[in-house]
Amino acid sequence: MALLPRLAAGGLLLLMALAALDGKPAPPKLLQKLMDGGQRRSEDQAAAGRIIDYEDGDEPVAVSVGDTKQAARALSPLRKPQPLCSCADMSDLECMNFCRLDVMWVNRNRKPSPIQSS
């Protein structure tokens, strides 16, 4: 339901922009605002897509967004991932389901208490 007001506001903004242009070509700044959704990107947001590497010398080297996986692999040592769960075996379906959802599950060895009837 929250998507509907956003779509209505976006459509209204587009209609107002088209009415203001009245057949004239759109200025580049208006086109950029429409493409960005009316929000400006800050320098921090623009820099978030870059990795700065000081490995080979004093000059920082910026790595583009497409190379981030390669740069991360090159800089990080190989290590085994830590197991998230302590499932006793593959037949414990509840534990395996939580592991699949990345929820930590710790099996505790408890003895089941017998059912007491009155």
UniProtKB/Swiss-Prot annotation:
Tissue: Expressed by the venom gland.
Entry keyword set: Cardiotoxin, Cleavage on pair of basic residues, Disulfide bond, G-protein coupled receptor impairing toxin, Secreted, Signal, Toxin, Vasoactive, Vasoconstrictor
Paired cysteines (S-S): C85-C99, C87-C95
Main location: secreted
Gene Ontology cellular-component terms listed: extracellular region
One Pfam family per UniProt: Endothelin
Record's comment on post-translational modification: Different length molecules ranging from 17 (85-101) to 30 amino acids (85-114) have been found in the venom.
Full protein name: Sarafotoxin-i2
Organism, as annotated: Atractaspis irregularis (Variable burrowing asp)
